[in-house]
Regions:
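A structural signal for conserved, well-ordered secondary-structure elements
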Residues: 1-337
Length: 337
């Protein structure tokens, strides 16, 4: 623990430093590759797997899998439904430790639903009443999507304005929003790559991570503003070096914040997915789990380097860096004598 504290202190004082800003092309390349993967792979796999809330359809919940293992229970349910309704496109999942079987199909008529309910009850050797049926229309999911997009647009606009006013430069705002979109694309893309079902709860999780990512970015940017604002005419650091120092100074804090945030989210994900079988808990926590990891990466390796790059072309920054390098060269000449 003491060594980790010393590590953080060394980063803060500059005794130890990682050249994060100077290697920004590497981080950009990694992000570009990830974004390419999460866009291309879902396309090759036929797109995202949207939940029944978005597409509409019928759902059947079997109270018990009759002592079968997960694979056997899924195969039995799939074959049973296809035997009754060959074109129903059944999607079978096992819910929780109680091994409840959930079957989702395309929209069915009342008679078709009753026939499948009876067939499932017979296949699993339970009463008809132990197989619950429900119909879900696509309207609710469409409303959630529309509201989510509206909320996303409003969030991006308001966050851009607030950050531009707070930091007094639109370039910090642009860097932060770019990092947010980076997080959203990769987090949502992971669902497409691994063919994880996208539900309204997952969409809510996608939007929630934007708040965390923005908070982490603001902490780093505040330190960047402090460092670059303190640098006067006699500064011994270039602008990029001041930004890099700020990132190193907040590195331990970013990691600690992420660990503290991800532990309870991971616990909820474990409990929701494996113990309770609660779909909503699982969907939200999975999106948050992925988003926190990606958000921490983007704050350190995307937002700060991008801001330094955006400012590097300014005349004032160029003059300052030129003056700093000239002072260093003069010092080396004097030292050589």
């Amino acid at each position: 623990m003491a060594s980790f504290a010393q590590f953080g202190n060394d980063l803060y004082t500059g005794k130890r430093s990682y050249n994060i800003i100077g290697k920004r092309k590497i981080w950009y390349g990694i992000s570009a590759l990830l974004i390419l993967i999460v866009i291309v792979v879902p396309i090759l796999r036929g797109g995202f797997l949207f939940g029944i809330e978005f597409l509409g359809g019928s759902q059947f919940q079997v109270a018990s899998s009759a002592g079968l293992n997960s694979t056997e229970a899924q195969v039995l349910a799939q074959n049973t439904v296809l035997k009754v309704e060959p074109g129903s496109n059944p999607r079978v999942t096992i819910v929780g430790q109680n091994s409840e079987v959930r079957v989702q199909t395309d929209q069915l008529t009342s008679d078709q639903s009753v026939a499948i309910q009876q067939a499932l009850a017979q296949a699993y050797k339970i009463k008809d009443s132990e197989v619950t049926t429900s119909f879900i229309g696509p309207v609710w999911g469409q409303d959630i999507t529309r509201q989510a997009l509206t909320g996303l647009i409003a969030f991006v606009i308001l966050a851009s304005i607030v950050m531009a006013l707070y930091f007094r430069t639109w370039k910090m705002s642009l860097a932060a929003i770019t990092a947010l979109l980076h997080d959203l694309i990769i987090t949502a893309g992971v669902y497409g790559v691994f063919h994880i079902e996208v539900t309204p709860a997952a969409v809510i999780g996608f939007l929630t991570i934007l708040g965390y990512s923005l908070y982490d970015t603001v902490v780093v940017f505040d330190k960047i503003r402090e460092n670059t604002g303190e640098d006067g005419a006699e500064s011994r650091r270039t602008f990029a070096e001041s930004v890099n120092l700020a990132v190193n100074q907040t590195l331990v804090r970013s990691i600690n914040t992420s660990v503290v945030a991800i532990l309870p989210v991971g616990s909820i994900l474990f409990i929701g997915a494996l113990i309770l079988g609660a779909g909503t808990l699982r969907d939200i926590s999975l999106a948050l789990f992925i988003g926190i990891i990606v958000g921490t990466y983007s704050t350190i390796f995307i937002a700060a380097p991008l801001y330094a790059q955006l400012r590097s072309g300014e005349d004032a920054v160029k003059k300052r860096d030129k003056r700093t390098r000239a002072v260093r060269e003069a010092s080396l000449v004097v030292a050589a004598k």
